[in-house]
Amino acid sequence: MKPIFVGDVVGGVGRRTLASLLPGLRERHEPDFVVVNGENAAGGVGITEKTAREILDLGADAITLGNHAYRHREVYDFLDREARIVRPANYPKGSPGRGHTVVEQGGARLGVSNIAGMLFLEAARSPFSEADAVVGDLRGQADYVLVDFHAEATSEKVAMGWHLDGRVTACVGTHTHVPTADSRVLPGGTAYVTDVGMTGGRGGVIGVRRQDALARFLTLTNVRFETADEDPWLNAVLVEAGTDGLATSIEQLLVPAD
């Protein structure tokens, strides 16, 4: 079984890059599933029903989110209705949406969960105890499990990889928008990478126009951020797994749009 996981899609340039490059990745790698982080799909922050449907229509089997899941109030009801989109599972009970889902293709069932880190981000419950609960909930419902750990601190992400090793197919990090060079299959059979990276304009500062980011750093004023369009790339990982639900390989896919 082979899923592709696409890192944070940032704004319109990210959606256009996904639309341009995903068909070629499908043809080249023949994935069974495509999971996309849509945390920044709408104008660089959050997601809307329109942008979510655009990503789903491109062929995503599931969309994960993160700390900007509720940036746009219009999406609350949609998150309750659309089972293919997951927000952080460790958000408060009663929050719009769901923390995990199961998608099926060709008889294979993939459980997808989104968990938010505690360090420098808001989370109602420990991501580690929530990960235990997710694994328990998905046991028997899914043949494979992919966890998107949306977190800031690399130490917390690495710790989560070890915490889940041997219990899920893949634990992939998102949020920082910078792909890390540590993709590997852990000893217990879990594919891991600290951060997948982003799908968007690499000519800025983690998806924001560089002049906006520099103005904020240089003046400490409240500068309006706009998404960077220059040098768009798609960052993703391709995981392969056996019938036991554990990974055999993970490959980073860092693809320029031009």
Where do the protein language model's features map onto the residues?
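Acidic, metal/ion-coordinating pockets
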Residues: 1-258
